[in-house]
Amino acid sequence: MPDLTVSVDVDAPVEQVWAALVDWPRQGEWMLATTVRPTVGTGTAVGDELEALTGIGRVGMLDRMRITRWDPPYRCEVLHTGRVVRGPGIFAVRPHGGGSTVVWTEELDLPLGRLGRLGWPIVRPVARWGLQRSLQRFARWAERYSG
């Protein structure tokens, strides 16, 4: 199962960073071309479900996920259950100096079988760039976050 991990340091305390990270409806303010919303529950407990729509205009991808671990303010794990994005995702927040480090890991079950595995080396750098760029935007946003 291919994985993808990116991280960023944030000049804000763990509790503030966590609150910003799991403010699902506002993720579009920092995540590239994405809107997120809870669909079952509030998105703050194991078993709650979320939908993320990533795209531009009428072209996009729907990512459905279920929260499988909720350990505030340090860790949220989800299971992606959509048609394209499948597998575990992990958001972790750790104290670092006077601030925090956010680590985002995706353990992907690639679609299209062998074709997906063959295409991963081409897709991976683009996916990594998008996640890293989103996390860089998140860091600046989270430092100003007030809920």
Language-model segments: which ranges?
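Conserved short-loop catalytic and cofactor-binding motifs
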Residues: 5, 37-38, 55, 119-122, ...
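Short hydrophobic/aromatic-rich motifs at helix boundaries and adjacent loops
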Residues: 8, 36, 61-63, 107-111
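Beta-strand/loop substructures that line and gate deep hydrophobic ligand-binding cavities in soluble
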Residues: 79-133
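Hydrophobic ligand-binding cavity/cleft-lining segments
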Residues: 1-45, 137-140, 147
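Residue-level detector of alpha-helix boundaries and kinks
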Residues: 2, 12, 52, 78, ...
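Glycine-rich portal/gate segments that line the openings of hydrophobic small-molecule binding cavities
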Residues: 28, 38-85, 96-101, 133-147
